[in-house]
Amino acid sequence: MADSSPQLAKLRSLMKERKVHVYVIPSEDSHSSEYIAACDARREFISGFTGSAGCAIVTLEAAALATDGRYFNQAAKQLDGNWTLLKQGLQDVPTWQEWAASQSAGGKIVAVDPSLLPGSAAKKLNDQVRKAGGADLVPLDENIVDIAWGDSRPERPCQPVSVLPDELAGKPVATKIEELRQELAKKNCPGFFVSMLDEVAWLFNLRGSDIPYNPVFFSYATITPETAILYVDESKLDDSCRAHLRENNVQVKPYDSFLPDARHLHTEVKTKRQAGGDGVVIGNFLISNKASWAMSRALGGDGSVEEMRSPVGDAKAVKNETEMNGMRACHVRDGAALIEFFAWLEDQLVDKKIMIDEVQAADKLEQLRSKQQHFVGLSFPTISSTGANAAIIHYGPEKGSCATIDAGSVYLCDSGAQYRDGTTDTTRTLHFGKPSDAEKKAYTLVLKGLIGLDTAVFPKGTTGFALDCLARQHLWKNGLDYRHGTGHGVGSYLNVHEGPIGIGTRVQYTEVPLAPGNVLSNEPGYYEDGNFGIRIENIMMVREVQTEHCFGDKSYLGFEHVTMVPYCQSLIERDMLTADEKAWLNAYNDEVLKNTRGFFEGDDLTMSWLTRETRPVE
């Protein structure tokens, strides 16, 4: 772990100059991105913690880092003695908001960069701070972490943007904009402001590479009843992008002019309301509930702005037939790359006795993926983990310090790729030797949970929250569980983690029912710290299913899995499976063999491994 004292000293000096006692440093950028560019990794810079989720709070005397169960082990290793780790979700552990508020008693000032915190989150934090005896939450428009970072802060990326043609996107830009305007008309809304990068990319059928692993670009958008404006650094756009936007009547303005334009539009609409008399009805501006406090303030705040779940995000989460066909196709190709990789890895470790470390394995997998049609890059850093490292849920192997893969231990590989026709995310846990009874039992309990969720049939209107227990039920019966969600939404050649849908216990998963066209992961797991970790993950699509009856005139839904990679035969405890589970597993194996064997003509090594791992489970 690196010493965080120098950067904390610089930050505290800046806090004192501004009479700030508590400074909040979220993980996200000004677009609420989960994955961020290096220039926006402020929480990592100040704390040394590299996980994708968490919040740092620095006072003049103390510092705390809050994160969720995926990152408890990682944070404990990366944080130095300056930091207190707040394990979110555990009993008697305060939330980061509660901890920040507790430091504000006596009228102390709590501050945050308003571009990094959603307006709703800022309001909640302000309420807690005031209740604890602090002053009103202060929006500091200058980010003092950036000042402390100084010249060593990386430059903001400015990568080229490309057009995603309709034959891959499945829906023209004009149609998407018109459907959004129809939603705005229902509320007499003068404008909707799009801040999430994947929503901008989806809305305009454009892709970029400003943020690693995510085909997005720094941008905002404004949609009014008359205009559509894309705010982006124009140097990113080539002639084809400009023509594409012109054809769809989209104006282009500089990225940095977004907030000034929002302030101007607020003033303009306010004037129209005042001049229009009783007959003029103009609703509030609409922004996403993830839009920044800075955006809300620019548009006039309470009384002028209505926060809501983004209608763009909702539309994006329901894939069209073109996108679903792309997801099917890219997962077959991706599965072929994984099958070839696992066969190669076993041959290296077991037959040839060659030492392979976690990073070398991840690099080999990326090389095999890169040969597949439409490959663009990875969708997240590959989690290549052996033995005890597999118990670190979001483990990140580092070159030079990672472990050598032990053929006698569990190996967990969670990986994915971006293809122009879809996004993949697959986890398989393997053992290249003789697994222990405990490992086999844990693996089979996890597999049973995956099958239970995959085969679920449920009425339309059911949420992911309601289905979560299907994946955990067999672990629960044994007093076991896992500290992460069961499923997240997946983008179509977009972010591998996509809202608003998911399967888990988060409150947000109670709000949005699953719908045909949703694409989600199914990834139960089990982890023993210091020993081993098990996770199995498939991607599946929500589809309508035919049932014998139709109670209440409701339609019923189920899942179609698209991941095509075998499970580890040596880790399956067959006596723990029911006849139905064995039948499902054998049907899945037949499906994998049928869809992928054509990739391995002349490749006896891979074909032998595939045949063995898809053999019937008796």
From Swiss-Prot:
GO terms for molecular function: metal ion binding; metalloaminopeptidase activity. The keyword Acetylation does not apply. Gene3D superfamilies: Creatinase/methionine aminopeptidase superfamily, Creatinase/prolidase N-terminal domain. Mn(2+) 2 binds at D414, D425, E537. GO terms for biological process: proteolysis. InterPro entries: Creatin/AminoP/Spt16_N, Creatinase/aminopeptidase-like, Creatinase_N, Pept_M24, Pept_M24B, Peptidase_M24_C, Peptidase_M24B_aminopep-P_CS, X-Pro_aminopeptidase_P. Keywords: Aminopeptidase, Hydrolase, Manganese, Metal-binding, Metalloprotease, Protease. PROSITE patterns: PROLINE_PEPTIDASE (PS00491). Mn(2+) 1 binds at D425, E523, E537. It catalyses: Release of any N-terminal amino acid, including proline, that is linked to proline, even from a dipeptide or tripeptide. It holds the Pfam family Peptidase_M24. One of its GO terms (cellular component) is cytoplasm. CDD domains: APP. The keyword Manganese applies. Binds 2 manganese ions per subunit. Disulfide bonds: none annotated. Its cofactor is Mn(2+). Its EC number is 3.4.11.9. Belongs to the peptidase M24B family. Catalyzes the removal of a penultimate prolyl residue from the N-termini of peptides. This is Probable Xaa-Pro aminopeptidase P. It comes from Metarhizium acridum (strain CQMa 102). The gene is AMPP.
